Amino acid sequence: MKFEFVRFSDLTSTNDEAKKYASEGGPLPALIMAERQSAGRGRLGRSFYSSDNTGLYMTLVFKAPDDDGLFLRLTCLAAVCSVESIRELFGLKAEIKWVNDIFLYGKKRAESLPSHSLLTVKNTLLSALV
């Protein structure tokens, strides 16, 4: 599967940019990435601090299959893949706090936030990973 990678140095939010990208008909699937977010949001729309060049801020955009259980599976899959990658690549003690929070040495460092937006593109899924 071929992905489009769209990288920015600074965005208000990768989620906002992903919605704009999908509504303008950008090729899917696509990964929208930023080195910094000035208005990132977490669960329940809470503000999310995104400092310069110290994190991974991204939103994955793809056509959603008709599957009611997809969001829970994506949430779990993103968390497991993130933790396994952190452990393997960096040798750090990463853990999952059910179901979407990723902890390093007892402190929350990331979360996955699958969400669904119909936008103007029918059946488009926006999924913020980590």
Language-model features: where?
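N-terminal lobe of the biotin/lipoate ligase/transferase fold
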Residues: M1-L89, A110, T124
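Solvent-exposed residues in well-ordered beta-strands and their adjoining turns
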Residues: V61-P65, S115, V130
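Acidic (Asp/Glu) carboxylate-rich active-site/surface patches
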Residues: A79-K122, L129
